[in-house]
Amino acid sequence: MEGLVTLILAAGLGKRMKSKHPKVVHKVCGKPMIEWVVDAVEEIGSKEVIVVVGHKAEEVKEVLKERVKYAYQEVQLGTGHAVMMAEDLLPEEGNVLILTGDTPLITSNTLKELINFHIKEGNSVTILSSVLEDPTGYGRIIRDKSGNVIRIVEDKDATEEEKSIHEINSAMYVMDIAKLKKALRMITNNNAQGEYYLTDAVEIIRDMDGKIGAFTVPSEEITGVNSRVQLFEAEKIMRKRINYRHMENGVTIVDPDTTYIGAEVEIGADTVVLPGCVIEGKTKIGSDCEIGPNCRIVDSEIGDGCSVTYSVILSSKIKNNVKIGPFAHIRPETVIQSNVKIGDFVEIKKSIIDEGSKVPHLTYVGDAEVGKNVNMGCGSITVNYDGKQKHKTVIGDNVFVGCNVNLVAPVKIGNNAYIAAGSTITEDVPEGALAIARSRQTNKEGWVQERIKKGRL
């Protein structure tokens, strides 16, 4: 919105979180709380965003980097004091949207409606309010007999009569900047907490003949996060929003209550997500896939028509029509091309598996290039580590690797080669060759009976 400046208060200690980290960097559905707020503000086109930081400021700056400007509140002396610390960064006129960094559930639609209401009503201050069944802990909106807002009283300073009011202050506002700057010079810390309340500025602006209004929204959006329990509650609401959005876009989520999908995940239409899945980071999943049950996928790309069952995929790329699992572990920097099968109890690490190949079960492939239409037998492994360094295995196209084979890297297997079961391969295998590297079998007939006679069995 043209000319709008946003001020986000994020300097609090967050003592109830019992954490060494600032409250606002704790994550909701994989994204720091403060980032949810900044995202919502950017969606409405705020001209400038200023964040007031204090406690562990560097951690907040590490999250937001250069997306915003910063003001510093070295000592936490209340919300009014926090705004004072940013006063020099505010223009002389216009409107400022004041938000808190611990309200990740606020949406851009609500902010647009709040600002439009403020402008339409010609208010000097518009308070974002809500009606709570239990308003304990929140400041109350005090209205006169005509319903006009006259002031806000903090919970700790409220009388018993005022505490019976259920309309609460969310600590989010739109304010006329010129009037706000005048009011900041007049507020005092003469209250139970010895702090400078921004709420006092509301009453001062009213006394300047400024019009005060309140825009009421559902309580869900203004919920602040002050403890781990409230973090869980916010997470639950956000997870429901995310899951419902995917379902509305054509994704089947069989049990949304047991499905965790991060904020930045993309999923194509007609994909089915079964119970117990955790899909995080910047993961992209194509159409017509079946994911789960009980999978974890992080920062990975999965193409169309794939099946992933009881498996973990980390920072990897999976092309189309790939079957993975059950109980496979795809580790970072792996690329699996189309029409590949990765079966049960298989681990793939930093490797390329080319089209049409099969790694069906009980196999480790690390630091390897596996060609097209390769079959890796049960129990086959690439021996990639010599105790100091990792080494590469290269397997050509149409190679058959028998069961219980060790490929000791660095080693190359030529196209169309066969590796006999039980072999430990330490040298390159030529194209089209059969490699056998195992001891000959020796049968000692009558050995068992002889041992029995001697009392040794």
UniProtKB/Swiss-Prot annotation:
Swiss-Prot/TrEMBL cofactor(s): Mg(2+)
GO cellular component: cytoplasm; membrane
Tagged with keyword Zinc: no
Residues binding UDP-N-acetyl-alpha-D-glucosamine, per UniProt: 9-12, 23, 73, 78-79, 139, 154, 169, 226, 331, 349, 364, 375
GO biological process assignments: cell morphogenesis; cell wall organization; lipid A biosynthetic process; peptidoglycan biosynthetic process; regulation of cell shape; UDP-N-acetylglucosamine biosynthetic process
Region (Linker): 229-249
GO molecular function annotation: glucosamine-1-phosphate N-acetyltransferase activity; magnesium ion binding; UDP-N-acetylglucosamine diphosphorylase activity
A Pfam family the protein falls into: Hexapep
Active site per database record: H361
Major site of localization recorded for this protein: cytoplasm
Biological role: Catalyzes the last two sequential reactions in the de novo biosynthetic pathway for UDP-N-acetylglucosamine (UDP-GlcNAc). The C-terminal domain catalyzes the transfer of acetyl group from acetyl coenzyme A to glucosamine-1-phosphate (GlcN-1-P) to produce N-acetylglucosamine-1-phosphate (GlcNAc-1-P), which is converted into UDP-GlcNAc by the transfer of uridine 5-monophosphate (from uridine 5-triphosphate), a reaction catalyzed by the N-terminal domain.
The name this protein goes by in its record: Bifunctional protein GlmU
Species: Thermoanaerobacter pseudethanolicus (strain ATCC 33223 / 39E)
